[in-house]
Amino acid sequence: MRQLARTAALDYGRDRIRVNMVSPGPMLTDLFFIHMDAAEDPAALRATRENRQPLGEILDPQLVANTVLFMLADEAAGMTGTDVVVDGGLTAGFDYRNVSMPGVDGRTGSGSA
């Protein structure tokens, strides 16, 4: 999808058509809550998910909507061929050694018997 957006941006740029995309990360959507409700311990699963996020929280979908609104605004007229990642920093890199997950040794990443 990213390369398609870039190619379309090149193809249509001279016509003043901008092509961008948004790549969302974990969000507080209905699907997220269905997944949580199906868990044995929803509170623990949510805490684990939030702990994995560099910002420490699962994001509200409104943040994606706000990003799209900005990209549509005149203030973003110079943006084209861009992928804006709204994931709370998850894809920027993450140190899993500092995350407590049941059955995993945080120092080595290996499972415990």
Describe the residue ranges of each PLM region:
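Conserved active-site helix of classical SDR/Rossmann-fold NAD(P)-dependent CH-OH oxidoreductases
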Residues: 1-6, 10, 17, 65-66, ...
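Residue-level signal for well-ordered alpha-helical positions
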Residues: 7, 34-35, 82
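Alpha-helical segment proximal to the catalytic Tyr-Lys
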Residues: 10-11, 77
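A short hydrophobic alpha-helix cap/turn motif
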Residues: 12-14, 27, 59, 72
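A glycine/serine/threonine-rich, flexible loop-to-helix segment
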Residues: 14, 27-52, 95-113
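Conserved beta-loop-beta element that borders a ligand/cofactor-binding pocket
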Residues: 15-25
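C-terminal helical subdomain
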Residues: 21, 43-79, 84-88, 112-113
